[in-house]
Amino acid sequence: MATTKSFLILFFMILATTSSTCAKLEEMVTVLSIDGGGIKGIIPAIILEFLEGQLQEVDNNKDARLADYFDVIGGTSTGGLLTAMITTPNENNRPFAAAKDIVPFYFEHGPHIFNYSGSIIGPMYDGKYLLQVLQEKLGETRVHQALTEVAISSFDIKTNKPVIFTKSNLAKSPELDAKMYDICYSTAAAPIYFPPHYFITHTSNGDIYEFNLVDGGVATVGDPALLSLSVATRLAQEDPAFSSIKSLDYKQMLLLSLGTGTNSEFDKTYTAQEAAKWGPLRWMLAIQQMTNAASSYMTDYYISTVFQARHSQNNYLRVQENALTGTTTEMDDASEANMELLVQVGETLLKKPVSKDSPETYEEALKRFAKLLSDRKKLRANKASY
């Protein structure tokens, strides 16, 4: 009798633990963040293609798309472009691009986007082709139509403030319901490389609202992971589906952050004697490069520390290549040879260990994430059916 009673107690303890775990997984906020980096966006595109393929395999559904699994997808610069591609709906209200379509997009359009304008007083590239192709691909779609919450950053040089385009901001700031092609060009309009972007929307009163925007990297310095987390936190507080989540409860956040590559020496190394001969333009190029790399490192350091402090280190995965060399470090080298190298970088990265202390490869970690994303989606669907 005592044995039976002990067994029943143990059974119900396991059942309670299992139910608690399922509830936590069901209420997890899933976040995808994609760095900026110009043509180096090919690297995270390879990672996204692998992840989407895993989700299709796990769920036995060739039509599965990343937007079906993430509550928030954030990006800056080229990461903002990827965000738009996988969240903007087509005529069937499905993402107009599958992850496997992104690399071919770079190969087809990259050489035209990064086609030197020949100007010695303006930006290196006139941006006309970039804006044209964005208009063709994204059409008249606006932020509110995105298939999941988005977080795309830019910076307004007239107001001197960051501008964050998200669906959840629209009730308070309807002027942020801009066309996706305007947002994508703005987040990619890196100073020196592309002209700033001017466009207008309207306020709730019908008044004209002006935007004068440059690259989102000015606002997030290349890595939008913290921005994406903050949007996810607000979403969790406002959406009844996440009622158990407290502010900044990273235990119930699942974050995948994709980099566009750097190296341990911040892309390039310089000596004091070398830098002493630089003029203003050379310094601007170097500072942008150094700042992006340093900020990306510090963002990763902060987020990983916070997740570890909350015993949730497995909820955060940063996928980054830290050993780029030669032309692969350049954000605007869209030669076919360099793009092929970037594809190789992404494919090789999948086979590399996540850290020096872990034998788990990025490929294995992404498979683990795919299983979590799939299980969570099924739990959500089961709850909705009751």
From Swiss-Prot:
Q: State which tissues express it.
A: Tuber.
Q: Which PROSITE patterns match?
A: PNPLA
**Catalytic residues (positions):** 77, 215
| Signal peptide span | 1-23
- What stretch of residues is annotated with the motif GXGXXG? 36-41
Q: Where in the cell is it found?
A: Vacuole
Q: Which residues form a coiled coil?
A: none
Cite the PNPLA domain residue spans from the record.
32-229
A molecular function annotated in GO for this UniProt entry is: monoacylglycerol lipase activity
Query: Which key words tag this protein in UniProt?
Result: Glycoprotein, Hydrolase, Lipid degradation, Lipid metabolism, Plant defense, Signal, Storage protein, Vacuole
Chain ranges for the short sequence motif GXSXG as given in the UniProt record? 75-79
Gene Ontology biological process terms, A to Z = defense response; lipid catabolic process
Q: Which InterPro entries match?
A: Acyl_Trfase/lysoPLipase, PNPLA_dom
Q: Where are the glycosylation sites?
A: 115
What is the predominant subcellular site recorded for this chain?
Answer: other
- Which top EC class applies here? hydrolase
Q: Which domain of life is it from?
A: Eukaryota
Q: What does this protein do?
A: Probable lipolytic acyl hydrolase (LAH), an activity which is thought to be involved in the response of tubers to pathogens.
Q: What else is known?
A: Patatin have a dual role as a somatic storage protein and as an enzyme involved in host resistance. This tuber protein represents approximately 40% of the total protein in mature tubers.
Q: Describe the family membership recorded for this protein in Swiss-Prot or TrEMBL.
A: Belongs to the patatin family.
What remark about domains does the record contain? Answer: The nitrogen atoms of the two glycine residues in the GGXR motif define the oxyanion hole, and stabilize the oxyanion that forms during the nucleophilic attack by the catalytic serine during substrate cleavage.
- Protein name (Swiss-Prot/TrEMBL): Patatin group M-1
Organism, per UniProt? Solanum tuberosum (Potato)
